[in-house]
Regions:
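"…together with the soluble PPM/PP2C metallo-phosphatase catalytic core" -> "…together
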Residues: 2-235
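Membrane-proximal soluble regions of multi-pass membrane proteins
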Residues: 55, 226-263, 267
């Protein structure tokens, strides 16, 4: 019996990850309420102080369990994204300078492009790849502003990526799907905990890596199209703000999901 089997039944690991995440968050919530309480402001979608940083449990459970259900690119991909989670956690605790955050995002993008065994990009396309990956990281972070939105979308996207060839790929991604599901039980409206930068930036990089891992361009484009409701909102909002001469990274309430919520839609209906 090997520690890292070539394949494993994904459902058991999915359920285990969901249960572990739910239980660990139950234990961690009192600490987060003392140390990482997000106070509502004019740009917030929530109306009462809510702890953030719960994504740290998703990162830990989904990453640690992945190798036990199949060793391969999908199981070591989360480890490549851990530096972003660490910087995101520090940023949740105390605001980091933007330069540090973007530097780690850039380095993570470089690592993903160099390490993932996908079709190598021509050298002249590398800058475009770096921009695309860092954009996805930030887009997922931008969209983490409504109860259950990013967590539920990422469940669908990671599960869709697991449908690729080879049973180990599906099994290796099962813990991340389960961890997201366990987190969603706490994050669904009215949310008792937010993901925080520790979770959203990690998941953005993870999704970018999963796109790069697709065996052919058709599957990669299909995965991107599945993410369009999430990433498209952020993309077009950035374009509008650039056209208006506004600062892209300044907090605002101009995303489609924010406008729908302001128009009276509930968090659950928008999600």
């Amino acid at each position: 019996m090997t520690l890292f089997p070539q394949e494993a039944a994904p459902w058991g690991f999915l359920l285990l990850a969901a249960l572990l995440t739910w239980l660990l968050l139950a234990l961690l919530l009192p600490v987060l309420r003392r140390r990482l309480l997000d106070q509502p402001n004019a740009r917030s979608s929530h109306r009462k102080p809510t702890p953030r940083g719960g994504g740290v449990v998703v990162v830990l459970v989904g990453t640690v369990l992945a190798p036990f259900c199949g060793w391969g690119p999908p199981s070591w991909l989360p480890f490549l994204c851990l530096p972003l989670a660490l910087v995101g956690l520090v940023d949740d605790l105390r605001d980091l300078p933007a330069g540090i955050r973007y530097a780690v995002q850039f380095l993570t993008a470089v690592v993903l492009l160099l390490v993932i065994p996908s079709t190598p990009l021509p050298w002249w396309l590398m800058p475009l790849g770096l921009v695309a990956i860092t954009a996805v990281i930030n887009f997922v972070n931008f969209m983490d502003g409504l109860d259950g939105l990013v967590a539920s979308c990422m469940i669908v996207l990671v599960a869709a990526a697991s449908l690729g060839p080879g049973p180990a790929a599906g099994a290796a991604l099962a813990p991340m799907v389960g961890a997201l599901a366990g987190f969603l039980l706490w994050n669904w409206s009215p949310a008792q905990v937010f993901m925080g930068d520790v979770g959203s930036t990690f998941l953005g990089a993870l999704f970018a890596g999963l796109v790069l891992l697709q065996p052919d361009p058709i599957r990669a484009v299909g995965l991107l199209l599945a993410a369009f409701p999430l990433l498209g909102d952020a993309f077009f909002c950035v374009l509008r703000r650039l056209a208006a001469g506004e600062r892209v990274f300044q907090a605002h309430r101009l995303h489609l999901y924010q406008r729908l919520q302001q128009a009276g839609w509930s968090h659950a209906h928008v999600t």
